[in-house]
Amino acid sequence: MTKDDIITLPNPHLRQKSSKIHVVTNDVVKLADEMTAAALDWEDSRPHEISAALAAVQVDKLERVVIVRADFERKSTREFITLINPEIVKYEGEIVEDFEGCLSVKSIYGKVPRYSKIRVKAMNLDGEEVRIKAEGFLARVLQHEIDHCNGLV
């Protein structure tokens, strides 16, 4: 996949809820790899921006798969972590309003209120449960991508 496979508004699929994955198959692993390729291709076309994360719906696959950059600080670190069926199990901290961008909403940034801390439950590519305690930018990114899985843009 390339950046051209990333769908944008007003594509109606972005407003549809993604389906839960019950078994991690080779197709799911391939999808995560293709999503990573598309995110990195998008990033390579923008020298001063990073691709923080991507949800499968953004490449027109209505499955609850999210990739999240392993290191937001270094663009040279091109590794992403895959989360399958991510769900927020706890909201914590204060609600903070800050600007967000989206690969599916070209050239528009908007202020969005998000919890400063969350806890997320998901599966990894081995089908094992993972739990993440996130705060700050990671918490914001995870809430954004989980919104995508729920058909929210």
Feature map (PLM): residue ranges:
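Positively charged
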Residues: 1-153
